[in-house]
Amino acid sequence: MSSSGTLSNYYVDSLIGHEGDEVFAARFGPPGPGTQGRPAGVADGPAAAAEFASCSFAPKSSVFSASWSAVAAQPPAAATMSGLYHPYVSPPPLAAAEPGRYVRSWMEPLPGFPGGAGGGGGSGGGGGGGSGGPGPVPSPGGPANGRHYGIKPETGAAPAPSAASTSSSTSSSSSSKRTECSAARESQGSGGPEFPCNSFLRDKAAAAAAAAAGNGPGVGIGTGPGTGGSSEPSACSDHPSPGCPLKEEEKQPPQPPQQQLDPNNPAANWIHARSTRKKRCPYTKYQTLELEKEFLFNMYLTRDRRYEVARILNLTERQVKIWFQNRRMKMKKMSKEKCPKGD
């Protein structure tokens, strides 16, 4: 081996570190094909000792001219170095105790790192025991940005098989059926109440089935106590049962929103103008009957009698005076209709 090759091996070995090969093998798995690593017995054989002893750092020009090409010609060594910064966290002990559930760890392999979207070479955490992530494995033609978080897998669907995770697909198929609610519930603890995700849909489907099993197809929810069986009337029903009283606010129809008037636009104000006069206050039947009786006795009232009638009927003197005036005009009009001018 030439001096340039020896220097290149020594350069890569110094970058990797002084830990043993067993530590890297246990952490990142066996190296890929063509990876040139540190020899097993570097200082064991006399040939290797003689080879390292022949290194000379005096001729600097020969070192820089010959070592750059040798270092650049080793891409597998650079791939081994990228594994040093792989953010991997060991699976939590709860997953081993309960294999049917899965707790998402806070730090999972990022999609940008090599192996983050991979097929099980120590890239996932969870119920698989560190043998592979339970998330969907991307196909060779699919997106390369890693797993999609927050997407619920199909019921009973196992992750797509790959060359590296064929043996771990059976162990992760049970954990692939999990939902996000179970993961959040286990992360918070088992002390709180459990609310299933699809409880609302299940209750709705049960109510629809109970309504369909009633007297006929036209039976709906909240149509009465004798039609739906055990179906409960809804709060928004127009025909509630007697056992479910609604508030007055819900019974009243919704009021249309009032239009805002623009003080700078008199035309719009005229379109939406309101009358300034007071609203018409009709008399009650009792007041009208008493005024008619008084009108039959006398078409004109004195001031004292008008005051007395107003006090009895709980009216003002002005209201009594106006009513008598209108009643006299009505009587005059009726008399003109009965007696036309031609006769």
UniProtKB/Swiss-Prot annotation:
Family annotation (Pfam families): Homeodomain, Hox9_act
Ranges where the record places region Disordered: 113-196, 220-267
Compositional bias per record (Gly residues), positions renumbered to this chain: 113-134, 220-229
Subcellular localization: Nucleus
Record feature DNA-binding region, as residue ranges: 276-335
A single GO BP: single fertilization
Gene3D superfamilies referenced in this protein's UniProt entry, alphabetically: Homeodomain-like
Coiled-coil segments on the chain, per record: none
Keyword vocabulary terms for this entry: Developmental protein, DNA-binding, Homeobox, Nucleus, Transcription, Transcription regulation
Cross-referenced SMART domains: HOX (SM00389)
Transmembrane segments: none
Biased composition (Low complexity): 157-176
GO molecular function annotation: DNA binding; DNA-binding transcription factor activity; DNA-binding transcription repressor activity, RNA polymerase II-specific; RNA polymerase II cis-regulatory region sequence-specific DNA binding; RNA polymerase II transcription regulatory region sequence-specific DNA binding; sequence-specific double-stranded DNA binding
Cellular component GO terms held in the UniProt record: nucleolus; nucleoplasm; nucleus
Main location class: nucleus
Function: Sequence-specific transcription factor which is part of a developmental regulatory system that provides cells with specific positional identities on the anterior-posterior axis.
Family that this chain belongs to: Belongs to the Abd-B homeobox family.
Name of the molecule in the record: Homeobox protein Hox-D9
Lineage of producing organism: Eukaryota, Metazoa, Chordata, Craniata, Vertebrata
